[in-house]
Amino acid sequence: LWALEELGLEYELINMEFPPRATYPGYLDLNPLGTVPTFTDGELVMTESSGICHYLEDMYGSRALGVAKDHPAYGEYLNWLYRSDATLTFPQTLVLRYTRLEPEERRIPQVVEDYSIWYHSRLRSVEMALEGKEFLCADKFTMADIAVGYALFLGVSLGLDERYKPNCKRYLANLMERPGFKSARQKQQG
């Protein structure tokens, strides 16, 4: 959603109760995983956030939010773009599951503690990368910043931001001031 706003693309947003597989008729037909997000573009259906960001930039961004393949920071850009889901968001999904989604009797505090620690240990790479920098790579705002910024924002909703270090705090605060971020949040909240 944030990527669509930053690119200025038109789209239809369907807000659903979470988790959508339980409350939205036909959602499992569109996305058998029952996860969010689900992005469609014509006949194409995508369900991986980083892949969606990559696709949007390649198809519609004209490198506005990407890094050219011949740029020295291209590999770094892709690494950050995909690190967001694989490394930063993954442990948060377990924190979310075992603090909010599971019935009280199935919640496992040790899982929450372990994966919170794991998440914070993974943020060391973000903290180091942002030392003396405004953005993660290529000296500009990119889809990688959207992806990693969203992971940091998700941490706020889970109460994990209390242990964010100064660079991560500054970075997230700056990203949250972007008009595209604000517009996406407003539309998401209805």
Regions found by a protein language model. Name each.
Residues 81-179:
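GST-like fold's C-terminal all-alpha helical module
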Residues 13, 139, 164, 184-185:
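A generic structural-conservation signal
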Residues 181, 185-190:
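Terminal-tail/helix-coil boundary detector
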Residues 17-20, 144, 189:
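Conserved beta-strand edge residues that scaffold enzyme active sites
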Residues 1-110:
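GST-like domain detector, emphasizing the conserved glutathione-binding G-site
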Residues 57, 151-152, 185:
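Active-site-flanking alpha-helical
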Residues 29, 177, 186:
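Phosphate-coordinating loops and pocket residues in cytosolic domains that bind phosphorylated ligands
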